[in-house]
Amino acid sequence: MTTTSSSADSDAAFERAAELLTAPSALVHLALDEARVVVSYMSPRWIAAGTTFIREGDAHDEGFMALVLDGEVVVDGITVSRTEPLTIKVLGPGSLVGEVGLVDQEPRSASCTASTDVLCAILTRDALQALIEASPAIGAKLLLAIAANLAERLRDNARKLRLYAKLAKTMHQELEHYTLAALKAAPPPRA
């Protein structure tokens, strides 16, 4: 990762990015020396507060993931019953966004907006391919770490869906109960 500031600042930013990449909120499966190799394929990007840098449904972006180094990112999406975005998560330093779009080349599944000025390290699909060609073992470990993160999110979403299904069933039963009670309490229809 290169920046336009002094060499000492660049080295510190590089090391911070590598440390954040190994944090539990990112890719805990990578060792620090492996993270340093990955970070060498990333490029820094400043994103102004209020900027949506990943748009849900966008199929035409360059395909990248971002490691948040500083600032906060709001992840949101449009649900079936809403026209306004629903905030899914607020992420800070050490968090990754965009991993799905990096690997699957499909339309983005959520939007990401900088809620503050954000500094992040970007890994593009082309840079990932170069990493895999130059360091296949580290590239494979990176992809496995990304897959593990995505699997954990999938499990979390499955738990939430089970909870929502139970809630919907309970609400349906309550609605039936009160509907039957109201029908029994209503006066008989006039002839």
Explain the meaning of each model-derived region:
Residues 1-191:
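Cytosolic regulatory regions built on CNB/CRP/Popeye-like sensor folds
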